From Swiss-Prot:
Changing residue 121 to E: Enhanced susceptibility to Hyaloperonospora parasitica. The gene is RPP2B. The keyword RNA-binding does not apply. It comes from Arabidopsis thaliana. This is Disease resistance protein RPP2B. Residues 15-180 form the TIR domain. SMART domains: TIR. Disease resistance protein that cooperates with RPP2A to confer resistance to Hyaloperonospora parasitica isolate Cala2.
């Protein structure tokens, strides 16, 4: 069973009071001390004054009050030492300071510090007659003298004779707050993972240190995201900075219950130190507010009038004041807030911790609950409220109850959670509710422009309503897609079922397959039904009568689709109906019917309202025989309708923007398209009957034209001068149309695999907007036309598999970024005549596979932006030494360079080197790269099938890798990374049969199990080195495009708790480098070694639990395996041996690694690198984000934590 234990308290001690005040009553009780106590209490500080015990209470009770206080204020006055009671107090206070860090603030009221310290002046007499106090106990008297001296040396305050007492009290209060914060700060609860980072972000926006402005900050987010919690933490940590402060809770509820005038009176009462201000008599008390620096938090604000009534205008507040408005309505903040903090969801780790703390009282689940915990965390999607309520409901229940609860939640949302979330829905008006439910039930994740068009009506401007829903945190619009939280989605669908829940035909929105089958088979639908979305994967068959849609007269949305088969899935057998339906509702706006089983639409259907029509994979031959009113149509998709003959019925679709006819293999006429003057997108891919475009065919608005796969298309003419993307891939054209310069907006020209294409137009260079030119696979193309003028926009030029032997003059392609010239492996013809790339300073990716290159020019180093260089299958024997100056180079592909004998010093930022199959390679530079300590830069060196590398060379490679891992790990610790870093810092691979001897844990097979020594996870722990030997020789070879060597580690404690991680040791990805890649085949054993940084919450596990060492990991296991590109385990190769070492940071003076040879050259060069790096420009050493190649590298070296705990 799952049991909870108490989590850490939010306070550090069990103190009942903030401050104990020690004073001499006769001196100050009725003036200074009474003022001080009143002032402290007015600022919210809990004060104990020993005046309460003057009536004869025992001194032991007085000492108890000192012990129950966080700090003491000692008011030294003229007669203070004449009271043995006061002396006892100060002795006890100083004892507590020494033993328990009790805070002490001395105030010297009309007495000098030196008199207290040296017992002179008024403090002298009592110590001249020691028998009068403490019965002459000399030891006690000496202790009191030391206490007085120590107290007087503490920084405190001397009462100013000629200054204002209120100003003096202000200073005391400020210092008291500071000391209380230091002694017992508002400790952020450890049962709220993620709250610290969120509160700091809010504090940044509030800019507390700036007293020259009044600042209003909004805290925004959906219900249950933690807005109030974050603001409350910030409030409690900072309220002491202000003269007045108040946190008004739940204004929406309290304003309805008590009214805004009451809340405003309450606010003023707190801000003005309890003064009763009659708002009705005095109006708004601006003068009172201007005199104080205030901190106000308004929680759960839902209306503009609440802000106006409670806060008013900013100019009535004193500079330095701060106001926080907590709301789920962004619109309220647009004119009232200077900045807005949007509270994010919890990430996976934070969510798992919060859930486990609620249920188990620890940061991780017990072993039997791991998988179910992951499922519940996934269900909550980072919403703290959901995690707390779910955890509360699961507390003390066994695993069977958990399983049943999870199954129940898949169908029925949690009632308590839904009740909380519905408050947001109930605040909407009718139009907002309608649009919200349509999105939740039907259109979640669709494009926002599409949804607004579909939901638009005479009464509703859906675009405005969607913006309002976004402002209220009920939906988000990201990358033009409309999204909502999973739990809000579930809430919307639950609300959608509520009306007439027993009669499906009377509900407005239907998606349950049983309900839909019922109303279609029994014709029980009514005009109430607004939308029907049927997932055909959930039903076997439906008897569809011709009159099935007759009663659904108000139906607007109809969709029959298959979630299991996005492509053709033979869905026509589902509907058992021999004839076309008699009727479709004329109010249909949205009609999607995948695999529509009839050859036309109902003849009496008037599509005057139809905006979106999709009949992919249908049996339709034509839409209608007669012309229809289709002016509302904007999107039509008839893709893969193999029987479609023509487009009759669409000639009046003058507002159509997108027409998809992909795979309509019987279509050969496009006459109706001529009238589509608003058409932007036309897809005719794989229309194999299409031989040419109609003469005089012009569509001025067209921007994307796809003719790829039209195998019979031999001729192409320009049909729009507005085209931006032109796809002619795989067509039979022999030349591109002349006068192509008229395509002044053309960005992409795709001529891939046009095998009959022999010529490109001479005026190609006049395409001034062209960014990407794809010529790959144009095997008959032997040359490019001269580039007579600069093509400044061209960034991508792909010429793989062509017969081109001379590249164009690259000086006119000065902004070229990616150039690929890869020739097939079977092509033994002459390669490139020259390499004219020296002037391309922006070139970042260069692919030159199988180009018969035997030498790189020295000017190659001028390609200062180059990040990916592929030279595979060339005749190079060595690389120029100047290659070291390619400081941006991340990836170097040298696969199958069979003549390559040596490698010089390579660029310092290189992250991925693949020298597979370099059979002549004997020597590598020492070091291979200068190990710059760029933060979190990972490196992979692959030397598979490099059989001439001797053992010394391999050891040097490993030594360099280990040195670099130490430097990177030290940098990582220096930057104090938080979270989980399991990436391999360095990974190497080479032919071999043995685990290096310095690996302390070695086993045959693929599993290591070991007990952990005490204190193994000390402050110098930085990760692990891992090693495996993989055999390929008993197999025909590994043919996967990707191979990853992975390790699943499991750390377990005595009490059964555990945490599991997945490491990556390295491997390869054939898509890295050459675009003409092929799976590699290995025929021998290979060694894989990696050094993995491991900054994981292991310390937190042991330190933050109250079970002490029982929670500290005491055993560990490491299981190694191999996966392919689909993450499936590989069975075609075997792990023979494995090894593991923990890594610890070296002392600064340690110049050696344990058990491994490090050459002097490596040590010397690394030291030089550490010195040199300080003098380099930031652009040289910063970590660059490089798009595709960077993604490929990280994809190769990435690793993951399995859901926090093991999944």
């Amino acid at each position: 069973m799952a049991f909870a234990s108490s989590s850490s308290s939010i306070v550090l001690s069990k103190c009942e009071f903030d401050v104990f005040v020690s004073f001499r009553g006769a001196d100050t009780r009725h003036d200074f001390t009474s003022h001080l106590v009143k002032y402290l209490r007015g600022k919210g500080i809990d004060v104990f004054s020993d005046a309460k015990l003057r009536g004869g209470e025992y001194i032991s009770l007085l000492f108890d009050r000192i012990e129950q206080s966080k700090m003491s204020i000692v008011v030294f006055s003229e007669d203070y030492a004449n009271s043995w009671w006061c002396l006892e107090e100060v002795g006890k206070i100083m004892q507590r300071r020494k033993e328990f860090n009790h805070g002490v603030l001395p105030i010297f009221y009309k007495v000098s510090k030196s008199d207290v310290s040296n017992q002179t002046g008024s403090f002298e007499a009592v110590f001249q007659s020691p028998t009068k106090i403490f019965n002459g106990d000399e030891q006690k008297i000496e202790e009191l003298k030391v206490a007085l001296k120590t107290a007087s040396n503490i920084r405190g305050f001397v009462y100013p004779e000629n200054s204002s007492e209120p100003d003096f009290l202000d200073e005391i209060v400020k210092n008291t707050f500071r000391m209380l914060n230091e002694l017992s700060p508002c400790v952020i609860p450890d049962d709220l993972p993620g709250i610290e980072s969120r509160s700091k972000e809010l504090e940044k926006l509030l800019m507390f240190d700036n007293d020259e402005c009044v600042r209003v900050v909004g805290v925004l987010g959906m219900t249950g995201i933690g807005k109030t919690t974050v603001a409350d933490i910030v409030y409690k940590q900072n309220f002491q900075r202000f003269d007045g402060y108040e946190f008004l809770e739940d204004i929406e509820d309290n304003s309805k219950r008590y009214g805004l005038p009451y809340l405003y009176q309450k606010l003023l009462h707190k801000l003005l130190d309890g003064e009763n201000v009659d708002v009705r008599a005095q109006g708004r008390p601006e003068n009172f507010l201007r005199n104080k620096k205030l901190f106000i938090v308004l929680d759960n604000v839902t209306e503009e009038k609440q802000i106006e009534y409670l806060i008013g205008k900013k100019n009535v507040y004193r500079q330095g004041s701060r106001i926080v408005i907590i709301t789920r309505d962004k619109k309220l903040l647009q004119k009232n807030a200077d900045a807005t903090y949007v509270v994010p969801r919890l990430n996976d780790r934070e969510a798992m911790e919060l859930f486990c703390l609620q249920v188990f009282g620890n940061h991780y689940p017990t072993e039997e609950f791991v998988d179910l915990s992951n499922d519940f965390v996934c269900y909550a999607k980072g919403l703290p409220l959901a995690l707390k309520l779910l955890g509360k409901g699961l507390l003390t229940h066994d695993i069977n109850y958990w399983k049943k609860k999870l199954e129940f939640l898949q169908v029925n949302p949690d009632k308590e959670l839904q009740k909380e979330l519905k408050s947001s829905y109930k605040a909407l008006d009718d139009d907002q509710k309608s649009v919200f439910l349509d999105i939740a039930c039907f259109f979640r994740s669709e494009k926002a422009d599409f949804v607004s068009s579909i939901l638009k009506s005479d009464d509703i401007d859906a675009k405005d309503v969607m913006r309002e829903l976004e402002e209220k945190c009920l939906v988000t619009i990201s990358y033009d897609r409309i999204e909502m939280h999973d739990l809000l989605h579930a809430m919307g669908k639950e609300i959608g079922k509520e009306k007439s829940i027993r009669k499906a035909g009377e509900r407005r929105r239907l998606w349950n397959h049983k309900d839909i089958r019922d109303i279609l088979e029994h014709n029980t639908g009514t005009e109430c039904v607004r939308g029907i979305f049927l997932n055909m994967s959930e039903v076997r068959r439906i008897k569809l009568f011709p009159a099935a849609f007759t009663m659904l007269s108000k139906l607007k949305f109809l969709k029959f689709h298959s979630s299991h088969c996005s492509q053709w899935c033979d869905n026509d057998h589902i509907f058992q109906c021999s004839k076309v339906p008699d009727h479709f509702p004329d109010e249909l706006v949205y009609l999607h019917w995948q695999g529509y089983p009839y050859d036309c639409l109902p003849s009496d259907f008037d599509p005057k309202e139809l905006v979106d029509l999709s009949l992919r994979y249908s049996h339709i031959k034509q839409l209608w025989e007669d012309e229809k009113n289709t002016e509302s149509l904007r999107w039509v998709d008839l893709g893969q309708s193999k029987d479609l003959l023509n487009l009759s019925g669409l000639s009046r679709a003058k507002n159509l923007e997108r027409l998809d006819l992909e795979g309509c293999t019987s279509l050969d006429l496009l006459g109706s398209v001529k009238q589509m003057n608003e058409l932007i997108y036309l897809n005719l891919r794989d229309c194999t009957s299409l031989e040419s475009l109609p003469k005089g065919f012009k569509i001025k608005s067209l921007k994307t034209l796809i003719l790829s796969g039209c195998l019979k298309l031999k001729d192409f003419h320009i049909i729009s001068e507005s085209i931006e993307s032109l796809h002619l891939e795989g067509t039979a054209i022999e030349r591109v149309v002349e006068h192509i310069e008229s395509l002044h907006s053309l960005i992409l020209l795709n001529l891939k695999n046009c095998e009959k294409l022999k010529y490109l137009p001479n005026d190609l260079y006049k395409l001034k907007s062209l960014q990407e030119l794809v010529l790959s696979g144009c095997s008959a193309l032997e040359s490019l036309p001269p580039i007579k003028e600069k093509m400044e926009c061209l960034e991508i030029l792909l010429m793989d598999g062509t017969s081109i032997k001379q590249t164009p003059e690259m000086s006119c392609l000065s902004n070229l970024k990616i150039c690929s010239f890869c020739r097939p492996v079977i092509d033994d013809s002459t390669g490139l005549v020259v390499l004219p790339f020296s002037g391309n300073s922006f070139l970042s990716d260069l692919y030159l596979t199988n180009c018969n290159i035997d030498k790189l020019p020295d000017k190659f180093s001028s390609l200062r932006s180059l990040r990916c260089l592929c030279l595979s299958r060339n005749n190079i024997e060595t690389l120029p030494e100047s290659i070291e100056k390619l400081y941006s180079l991340l990836l170097l592909d040298l696969k199958h360079c069979c003549r390559l004998k040596s490698l010089p010093l390579l660029p310092s930022n290189l992250q991925y080197l693949d020298a597979h199959g370099c059979g002549s390679l004997e020597n590598v530079s020492k070091p291979l790269t200068i190990p710059l300590v760029t933060e979190r830069m990972h490196t992979t060196f692959i030397f598979t099938d490099c059989f001439k590398l001797n053992q010394a060379e391999k050891e040097d490679i490993v030594a360099q890798a280990q040195l670099k891992s130490q430097l990177l790990a030290r940098t990582s610790r220096h930057h104090n990374h938080k979270g989980l870093l399991l990436d391999p810092l360095v990974a190497v691979c080479f032919p071999g049969h043995d685990i290096p001897s310095w690996f302390s844990h070695q086993k045959m097979g693929s599993l290591i199990e070991t007990d952990l020594l005490p204190h193994w996870c000390n402050s110098k722990f930085i990760g692990a080195s891992l090693c495996v030997v993989v055999t390929f020789k008993d197999h025909e070879g590994h043919h996967a495009n990707r191979l990853s060597v992975r390790c699943k580690s499991k750390f377990k404690s005595q009490n059964g708790q555990f945490i599991s991680f997945s490491f990556c040791l390295g491997g390869w990805n054939e898509s890295c480098g050459s675009s003409c890649h092929e799976p590699r085949k290995l025929g021998s054993d290979h060694v894989f070694i990696s050094y993995n940084n491991c900054n994981v919450p292991v310390f937190k596990w042991s330190e933050e639990t109250n079970e002490g060492n029982r929670c500290h990991p005491t055993s560990a296991s490491f299981e190694f395996y191999l996966t392919d590109e689909t993450e499936r385990k590989l069975e075609c190769c075997e792990i023979l041996r494995c090894g593991m070492n923990f890594l610890y940071a070296r002392d600064e003076n340690d110049r050696k690694f344990q058990g491994i040879r490090v050459t002097d050259t490596v040590e010397r060069t690394s030291s030089e690198a550490l010195v040199t790096i300080r003098g380099q420009s930031h652009s040289r050493i910063e970590e660059r984000r490089y798009g595709r190649i960077r993604d490929e590298i990280m994809d190769m070296t990435g690793s993951s934590m399995i859901g926090g705990p093991e999944s």
